[in-house]
């Protein structure tokens, strides 16, 4: 398989011991860790980032507080519904339609979701049929820079690869009660 990417997204709320858990996740060899705490203040984000080495910070992508990206030499910023404007430090964005994927050509990568029914968001159902995803691969819309998000489990990784995605982004599968599920993360990387 090409350069398969695994992106881990943090739970919505900061938690005790988070910095140590982030270090363990990054040590697994993931592509990026998306630090997604929409309600966290800048001081909370700084506390987390201050506990990471320079190399570890290079793997971090922020969903908020973009002013910290250059200051901490982070991996980038992620555009989302809260921050849809193009930031100069932007590297990725969330897409919920194939048209949005096509329009995201300036990004290093983008998430397409929900591919399967969400694990972490109750009632957030798959947005794409098998036929639509296979056609999008044939049309060159789904490729190495498109990351599948939503309902991703170890058992679905092979199917995601068959659709032509460049990797997976995981949230619900990656965390349980503030503990990173390192075995699952490692299996996703195979």
Segments the model singles out, each with a brief description of its role:
Residues 125:
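Recognition helix of helix-turn-helix/homeodomain-like DNA-binding domains
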Residues 128-135:
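Glycine-rich S-adenosyl-L-methionine
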Residues 108-116:
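Non-cysteine beta-strand/loop elements that form the S-adenosyl-L-methionine
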Residues 116-122:
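A short acidic, helix-capping loop that chelates divalent metal ions and anchors anionic groups
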Residues 1-78, 82-86, 90-109, 135-138, ...:
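Conserved N-terminal beta1-alpha1 strand-loop-helix module at the mouth
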């Amino acid at each position: 398989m090409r350069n398969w990417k695994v992106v881990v997204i943090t739970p919505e709320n900061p938690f005790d011991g988070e910095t140590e858990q982030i270090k363990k996740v990054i040590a697994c060899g993931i592509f990026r860790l998306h630090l997604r705490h929409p309600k966290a203040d800048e001081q909370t984000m700084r506390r987390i980032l201050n506990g990471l080495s320079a190399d570890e910070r290079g793997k971090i992508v922020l969903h908020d507080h973009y002013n910290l990206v250059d200051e901490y030499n982070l991996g980038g910023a992620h555009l989302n519904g809260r921050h849809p404007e193009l930031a100069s430090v932007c590297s990725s964005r969330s897409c919920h339609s194939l048209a949005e994927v096509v329009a995201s050509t300036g990004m290093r990568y983008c998430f397409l979701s929900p591919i399967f029914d969400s694990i972490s968001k109750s009632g957030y159902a798959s947005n794409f049929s098998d036929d639509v995803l296979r056609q999008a691969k044939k049309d060159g819309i789904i490729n190495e820079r498109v990351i599948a998000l939503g309902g991703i489990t170890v058992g679905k990784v092979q199917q995601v690869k068959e659709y032509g995605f460049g990797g997976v982004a995981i949230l619900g599968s990656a965390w349980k009660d503030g503990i990173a599920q390192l075995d699952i993360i490692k299996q996703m990387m195979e």
